[in-house]
Amino acid sequence: MNNDVVELAKDLISRPSVTPLDEGCQTLMANRLAAVGFNIEPMVFEDTTNMWARRGNCDPVFCFAGHTDVVPTGDLNRWHTPPFEPTIIDNYLHGRGAADMKGSLAAMIIATERFVAKHPDHNGSIAYLITSDEEGPFINGTTRVIDTLEARNEKMTWALVGEPSSTHKLGDVVKNGRRGSLTGNLTVNGIQGHVAYPHLADNPIHKAVPALTELAQMHWDNGNEFFPPTSFQIANINGGTGASNVIPGELTVMFNFRYSTEVTAEELILRVVSILDAHGLDYDINWIFNGLPFLTGDGPLLDATREAIREVTGYETDPQTSGGTSDGRFIAPTGAQVLELGPVNATIHKVNECVNVADLEILANCYERILEKLLCK
């Protein structure tokens, strides 16, 4: 088996690029891409390193999208091997970012190099949109690059995001959409006082519980053939001073919606506000829009990806919209078709993150085949 993908993945993993750090990962990638004719455009916004790279000047534009940052390691004592010293054990490459998503980045680069060597005069353009701010607050990453591209009317036709989409084996699942994400930060106001004198206080916890119960039990929608029903989850709740004899003066609650295309963020906000008002709460609330839902239906990108996976692996892929959000949510509103295809996600964000070594070569072959189907017609 050719080990080019594994060696590049190891080089990337060895760089401790905990978000928003890049630690030279993009420079490594840029040097490889420049050598095969890409124009490299670094885009640094505050603490975030981004890269837009492009080979070709005409449509259609196929873009590989991904991130060089990784989540923190967690307890180092629980790792079998140092997280930034990539190690192969029983045919699995271990290290932080192996599956999310430095293995994918390596497969993208190798696939691109092989494709360009075989098809130097390919149709359209190949691009890369890479950020070091996907695992963090996602303020100065892909969103800022998209804003820059939109301002000069530079569009992508197709975007393939290297997120670890697979469930049991490489390519068994691709993500052809994602639910929207909306976070609410609620503060319920009361009056602090002594628990022995409740008539002189106003307990915000007691007042909020019925409203929160109604929100938690609410049926928001039925979903559809592509998306499960909208989910409401309380993520954090805090109230009280820690003392047993003090009624708190306020209660704070953070909750999140993962919502389908059957409802809008605006509709969810109106329904939440109506419930809070109906319970007579004195409250303040602010909203964080994390991303709109998107869906890529049948079309050139999904068709090419299905065919490529079938030809390389021998089995069919299953397009799904489950799971968390990705930077695909920022690309989709530009009008590009967006898919996610990457390694098995069983160990992502965990200690002892790893990826099957053979899967990296399979992934590179899938990526190369997709390029051929879209840019060699």
Swiss-Prot record:
Query: Which keywords does UniProt give here?
Result: Amino-acid biosynthesis, Cobalt, Diaminopimelate biosynthesis, Hydrolase, Lysine biosynthesis, Metal-binding, Zinc
Query: Known EC number(s)?
Result: 3.5.1.18
- Known pathway: Amino-acid biosynthesis; L-lysine biosynthesis via DAP pathway; LL-2,6-diaminopimelate from (S)-tetrahydrodipicolinate (succinylase route): step 3/3
Q: What superkingdom does the record give?
A: Bacteria
Q: Where does Zn(2+) 1 bind?
A: 67, 100, 163
Per UniProt, Zn(2+) 2 binds at: 100, 135, 349
- Catalysed reaction, written as an equation: N-succinyl-(2S,6S)-2,6-diaminopimelate + H2O = (2S,6S)-2,6-diaminopimelate + succinate
Question: Cross-referenced Gene3D superfamilies, in alphabetical order?
Answer: Zn peptidases
**How does the annotation summarize its subunit structure?**
Homodimer.
Task: Write the protein's name.
Answer: Succinyl-diaminopimelate desuccinylase
Natural source organism: Shewanella frigidimarina (strain NCIMB 400)
